[in-house]
């Protein structure tokens, strides 16, 4: 049986959640469970989630809004040995579970994520996607070189991050006080337990933020936020440059 619990934090994701849940229903092998943790959606997100509710797909309501809090709540309810954190607007390959289990079969690996290809209805954001791929490597090399050579790679939300449940709990999970770059913060904690690996497989994430900002502005904001984060600027300050676009 699969060991993977997939956790999806949601907030007003009615436009994409149904597609994502349909994709998860055809995974081979299937996930042990899918936990949808909603932060108070005001659209049809919760209704859509309940339509898919089953013995392996559960809907959880979070009293507190915020990805870190919602993902921690999902992790607390999860029964799998492995946790996979998935954004509602991200498409995954059918063998997602197998790739995750194979990656963590290496005991020297504490966590991992995928290569994110940013796509929209009419275009693929090759330039932005390439930068995000490279950022996984150059950000830790520049700002945490001692950890880079220990195996640190900085993963971000749309890369479908995964790790062992025990390592997640022992690392303290996501910091609820961090409103942005919470996955990167978790990488800093997980690398104390093993390498972080970006697997050579692609997931597709919505380009909705880039579509609103434009490629140049989006890349500039990503660079600015990443640079300030590397210098230790608080996530609370950085969040104001990364407004909600839904």
Identify the role of each PLM range:
Residues 95-127:
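Conserved donor NDP-sugar-binding/catalytic core segment of glycosyltransferases
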Residues 62-78:
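Glycine-rich, basic loop-to-helix element that forms the pyrophosphate-binding segment
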Residues 1-23:
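N-proximal low-complexity "stem/linker" segments adjacent to membrane-targeting elements
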Residues 22-31:
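Short, acidic, metal-binding catalytic loop of nucleotide-sugar glycosyltransferases
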Residues 31-40, 60:
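Short beta-strand/loop segment that forms part of the nucleotide-sugar
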Residues 114-121, 128-154:
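Short, flexible, basic/aromatic active-site loop/helix in glycosyltransferases
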Residues 83:
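Short aromatic/hydrophobic "clamp" motif used to bind/position activated sugar donors
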Residues 38-46, 90:
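A conserved acidic beta->alpha catalytic loop
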């Amino acid at each position: 049986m699969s060991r993977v619990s997939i956790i999806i934090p949601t907030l007003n994701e009615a436009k994409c959640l149904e597609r994502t849940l349909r994709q998860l229903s055809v995974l081979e092998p299937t996930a042990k469970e899918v936990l949808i943790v909603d932060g108070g959606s005001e659209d049809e997100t919760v209704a859509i989630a309940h339509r898919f509710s089953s013995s392996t797909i559960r809907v959880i309501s979070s009293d507190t809004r915020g990805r870190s809090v919602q993902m921690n709540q999902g992790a607390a309810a999860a029964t799998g040995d492995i946790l996979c954190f998935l954004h509602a607007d991200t498409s995954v390959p059918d063998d997602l579970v197998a790739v995750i289990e194979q990656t963590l079969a290496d005991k020297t690996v504490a966590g991992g994520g995928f290569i994110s290809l940013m796509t929209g209805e009419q275009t693929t954001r090759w330039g932005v996607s390439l930068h995000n791929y490279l950022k996984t490597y150059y950000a830790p090399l520049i700002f945490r070189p001692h950890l880079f050579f220990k195996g640190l790679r900085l993963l971000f939300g749309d890369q479908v991050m995964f790790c062992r449940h025990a390592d997640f709990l022992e690392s303290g999970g996501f910091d609820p006080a961090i409103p942005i770059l919470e996955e990167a913060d978790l990488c800093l904690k997980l690398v104390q337990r093993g390498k972080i690996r970006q697997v050579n497989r692609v997931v597709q994430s919505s380009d909705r933020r880039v579509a609103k900002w434009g490629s140049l502005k989006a890349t500039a904001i990503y660079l600015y936020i990443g640079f300030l984060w590397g210098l230790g600027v608080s996530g609370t300050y950085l969040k104001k440059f990364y407004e909600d676009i839904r």
